[in-house]
C-alpha cells in the first residue's frame, strides 16, 4: 500500500513548474507557456524501497493568484520552490515564497527543496550562478538542485529529495511538537 504525500510546487510565473511536474508524471516536455491557475497530478513512485503516491499541486505563479496560496500551502506536506536560472527576479522571489510557507504553517522550518530550473539553457543566458542557489538553500537549511524539465536532468531527483526531506522532518520528534494539534470534531446538521 502506498503512502499519500501532498507536494506543492511554487515559484514565479514562467519558471517551469508545470514543465517539471508534467515531465515527472507524464514523461513529456511541454515547451509552450500556458499560465496555470492550479492543476493536480498523481504519480506512484518507489523511493528508498517505500511506495508513495505523490499528489502534486502545480500552482499559479502570477501575482493575481497570490490570494489562493495560503489555501494550498496549508494542505502541503512539502514544497519545491522553483526559480529560473535565467531570471534574477524569480530567484529573488524564492525567499518570499519560503517566508509565506513558514508564516502559513506557523513554523520556523518545514520540508522544502530549492530548485534552479532551465539548467539546459546556455551559460550566456544565465542570470543566477549555481553557487548563489546553493548558498540560499544552505541559509534555509534546505537541499538545492538545478534541473532541466526539457532534458529531464534531476527531475525525479528533485521530487524524490523532497520526499526524503518530508520523511526526515517527520522522524524528528521536535517537529511533531511544533505542529498544531489535529482537529477532531463533529458537525451536526
UniProtKB/Swiss-Prot annotation:
Catalytic reaction(s) noted: GTP + H2O = GDP + phosphate + H(+)
MF terms in GO: adenylate cyclase activator activity; G protein activity; GDP binding; GTP binding; GTPase activity; guanylate cyclase activator activity; protein kinase regulator activity; TORC2 complex binding
Pfam families, sorted: Ras
Record propeptide residues: 187-189
NCBIfam families reported in the protein's UniProt record: small_GTP
Membrane topology value: Lipid-anchor
SUPFAM superfamilies: P-loop containing nucleoside triphosphate hydrolases
Residues carrying lipid (S-geranylgeranyl cysteine): 186
Cellular localization per UniProt: Cell membrane
List of residues binding GTP: 11-18, 58-62, 117-120
Organism per entry: Dictyostelium discoideum
PROSITE patterns reported in the protein's UniProt record: RAS
Annotated signal sequence range: none
Entry GO CC: cell leading edge; lipid droplet; plasma membrane; TORC2 complex; vesicle
Residue(s) carrying Cysteine methyl ester: 186
Keyword GTP-binding: yes
Activation and inhibition: Alternates between an inactive form bound to GDP and an active form bound to GTP. Activated by a guanine nucleotide-exchange factor (GEF) and inactivated by a GTPase-activating protein (GAP).
Protein name (record): Ras-like protein rasC
Keywords: Cell membrane, GTP-binding, Hydrolase, Lipoprotein, Membrane, Methylation, Nucleotide-binding, Prenylation
